[in-house]
Amino acid sequence: MFITRWLFSTNHKDIGTLYLLFGAWAGMVGTALSLLIRAELGQPGTLLGDDQIYNVIVTAHAFIMIFFMVMPIMIGGFGNWLVPLMIGAPDMAFPRMNNMSFWLLPPSFLLLLASSMVEAGAGTGWTVYPPLAGNLAHAGASVDLTIFSLHLAGISSILGAINFITTIINMKPPAMTQYQTPLFVWSVLVTAVLLLLSLPVLAAGITMLLTDRNLNTTFFDPAGGGDPILYQHLFWFFGHPEVYILILPGFGMISHIVTYYSGKKEPFGYMGMVWAMMSIGFLGFIVWAHHMFTVGMDVDTRAYFTSATMIIAIPTGVKVFSWLATLHGGNIKWSPAMLWALGFIFLFTVGGLTGMLLANSSLDIVLHDTYYVVAHFHYVLSMGAVFAIMGGFVHWFPLFSGYTLNLTWAKIHFIIMFVGVNLTFFPQHFLGLSGMPRRYSDYPDAYTMWNTVSSMGSFISLTAVMLMIFMIWEAFASKREVDVVELTPTNLEWLHGCPPPYHTFEEPAFVKV
């Protein structure tokens, strides 16, 4: 019974739970790796050997956090759990394909871990640029294992994307129009389209790299008429939409949380929010070369990518100000989930501002591959995506489990995490402006102070992670039942109680407008 329920599951709630558990476990591995990085950089001098092992840790940290933590939790966990409930569907459109999407991830994770264990490991950074990733600079199986791992994770995401698109377009009840769909459902739809369009390009790029390494092709080798810059174009055509894939479901969750805890019936500017997400999704595909300002593009090309990148700030600003307008005049409830949402809005905006600075091709020449870039994307990921995940988790935990967290501890947890991540990443702006480059295991002692501060912050974040594990244990141990939840048009997922029955919406639902 246990085997049939959890191994062969076709139930969206069970698969969502599997995704959440897998993402939490992978997140702890990724956090451990990030602490190794910060321990190495906590003071000048060497801690862990040479730069190769350091870069293997950096590479594994990036891949694990992106492909095995943020995406499984946001799209697999929250997406599977909430999308069918929010649109009144009995399950996902392809329940068995849903199961396969999940079970492709553990083998993929295993291959990634194997890549860091065999030979010298893949010390390429998550971008896996040739010629460093070629068979001379990285002889052995490591990079090949990484490529296979990415293939499996990519197939998993593509299948999941097909499933979500079909479910959202096809499985709404007849009375529900696309414009009565909750914003989280919209965000998952846009995310799924981005995945479906960008992942095949990554698959092509890394397959060409695989044949360059093993079958003597020369796609990326100038000696045979190839060009390593081609790989960068292919990778970033995937890589830039990918960062929007990581944040868009978070936008959807934040919209729900802000609306709910402001005591509002609906978010401010619903259609504006929908159009903003679709604009971000479209623009995300036409700005990729802003990651490549230093490879020597024409000045007019650089001008275009600078301008196009800055345009993305407009729909993003629409979303930020709509969240603030949703808060305005509301009866605000300072719950832990609301704290995460407010922290998200502030810190994501800070990360967006540093991104505006980096969008300038001339400034980026100076700041490229320094800690300024690291600070920028960790503000939008470590304090954007992660804060959205945490807010969504404490908000929907009663729905998933039927029990409530201790709200005092949840607030303390937020404060510790807030202090920790800011102490970790704010000083990295200073390091970057002072010219400290990324992906080095050591540094001149002029950079000691801010690196030490940054490493202290990372250990504060670690205590926050440990407190969260304890909070979850405490909730299941204490078994506090859930009070009745007020139903509004934006939180129909609570309709069936906490937790909902194994099968929901077995008959078509009707939407009263």
Curated annotation (Swiss-Prot):
Residues annotated as binding heme a3: 376
Binding annotation for O2: 244
Pathway stated in the Swiss-Prot or TrEMBL entry: Energy metabolism; oxidative phosphorylation
Segments in the Mitochondrial matrix topological domain: 1-11, 87-94, 171-182, 262-269, 328-335, 401-406, 479-513
Signal sequence region: none
Residues the entry annotates as binding Na(+): 40, 45, 441
The enzyme's E.C. designation: 7.1.1.9
Keywords recorded for this protein, A-Z: Calcium, Copper, Electron transport, Heme, Iron, Magnesium, Membrane, Metal-binding, Mitochondrion, Mitochondrion inner membrane, Respiratory chain, Sodium, Translocase, Transmembrane, Transmembrane helix, Transport
Binding site for Cu cation: 240, 290-291
A cellular component term, taken from the record's GO annotations: mitochondrial inner membrane
CDD domains cross-referenced by the UniProt entry: Cyt_c_Oxidase_I (cd01663)
Gene Ontology terms describing biological process: electron transport coupled proton transport; mitochondrial electron transport, cytochrome c to oxygen
Pfam families: COX1
Residues in the Mitochondrial intermembrane compartment per record: 41-50, 118-140, 213-227, 287-298, 358-370, 434-446
Positions of crosslink type 1'-histidyl-3'-tyrosine (His-Tyr): 240-244
Catalytic activity line of the entry: 4 Fe(II)-[cytochrome c] + O2 + 8 H(+)(in) = 4 Fe(III)-[cytochrome c] + 2 H2O + 4 H(+)(out)
Binding residues annotated for Fe(II)-heme a, in chain numbering: 61, 378
Gene Ontology MF terms: cytochrome-c oxidase activity; heme binding; metal ion binding
Membrane topology, record value: Multi-pass membrane protein
Lineage top rank: taxon: Eukaryota
Subcellular location field: Mitochondrion inner membrane
Membrane-spanning ranges: 12-40, 51-86, 95-117, 141-170, 183-212, 228-261, 270-286, 299-327, 336-357, 371-400, 407-433, 447-478
Quaternary structure and partners: Component of the cytochrome c oxidase (complex IV, CIV), a multisubunit enzyme composed of 14 subunits. The complex is composed of a catalytic core of 3 subunits MT-CO1, MT-CO2 and MT-CO3, encoded in the mitochondrial DNA, and 11 supernumerary subunits COX4I, COX5A, COX5B, COX6A, COX6B, COX6C, COX7A, COX7B, COX7C, COX8 and NDUFA4, which are encoded in the nuclear genome.
Family, as annotated: Belongs to the heme-copper respiratory oxidase family.
Known function: Component of the cytochrome c oxidase, the last enzyme in the mitochondrial electron transport chain which drives oxidative phosphorylation. The respiratory chain contains 3 multisubunit complexes succinate dehydrogenase (complex II, CII), ubiquinol-cytochrome c oxidoreductase (cytochrome b-c1 complex, complex III, CIII) and cytochrome c oxidase (complex IV, CIV), that cooperate to transfer electrons derived from NADH and succinate to molecular oxygen, creating an electrochemical gradient over the inner membrane that drives transmembrane transport and the ATP synthase.
Name of this chain's protein: Cytochrome c oxidase subunit 1
Organism: Dasypus novemcinctus (Nine-banded armadillo)
